[in-house]
């Protein structure tokens, strides 16, 4: 199915805003036979209702270790695997900080696992406050007495790396595991 990931957030975002950037890492070779991802170059500039003609669709054939980069407005889709072997890839998608991520990273990578990751990776999967007023949480297991909203980094037992306004008194509200 050829599609745009951009529509995951509905149609209220102006087209001039690119909400997402995708990386598709080839763990195995991506070939025409094993269904390499199909992509429509230039489709990020098309109107939403324009459909790709077969001769506009190309397969992103690449050797393992390669990466395909494209935005959420680019038409793309998986190809049909006609081989007997699986095509294995890793899709990492980045979206604007004020948008809900497509994958709920907090459930996919809970704090007890995220604590073992590098701080930069923790931030990339959402364990960071982002801009003012975005990314706070309340711990349902430990209702706060006087401070209810906390930045996500506190779930990992640390404060934000890049926030001067961080108050270290908030750390006492998070139990280490």
Question: What function would you assign to each model-found segment?
Answer:
Residues 6-7, 73-75:
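Short beta->alpha connector loops
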Residues 34, 78-79:
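Activation segment
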Residues 46, 50-69, 73, 79-177:
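Conserved double-stranded beta-helix
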Residues 1-61, 99-109:
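Catalytic core of non-heme Fe(II) oxygenases with the double-stranded beta-helix
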């Amino acid at each position: 199915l050829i599609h745009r990931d951009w529509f995951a957030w509905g149609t209220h975002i102006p087209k001039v805003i690119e909400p997402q950037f995708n990386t598709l890492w080839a763990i195995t070779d991506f070939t025409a036979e094993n269904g390499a991802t199909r992509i429509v170059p230039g489709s990020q500039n098309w109107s939403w209702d324009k459909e790709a003609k077969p001769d506009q669709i190309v397969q992103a054939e690449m050797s393992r270790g390669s990466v395909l980069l494209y935005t959420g407005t680019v038409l793309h889709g998986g190809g049909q695997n006609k081989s007997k072997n699986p095509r294995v890839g890793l899709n990492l998608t980045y979206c604007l900080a004020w948008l809900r991520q497509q994958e709920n990273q907090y459930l996919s990578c809970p704090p007890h696992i995220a604590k073992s990751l590098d701080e930069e990776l923790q931030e990339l999967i959402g364990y960071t406050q982002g801009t003012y007023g975005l990314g706070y949480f309340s711990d349902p297991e430990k209702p706060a007495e006087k401070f209810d909203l906390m930045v996500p980094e506190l779930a990992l037992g640390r404060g934000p790396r890049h926030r001067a306004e961080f108050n270290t008194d908030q750390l006492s509200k998070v139990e280490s595991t």
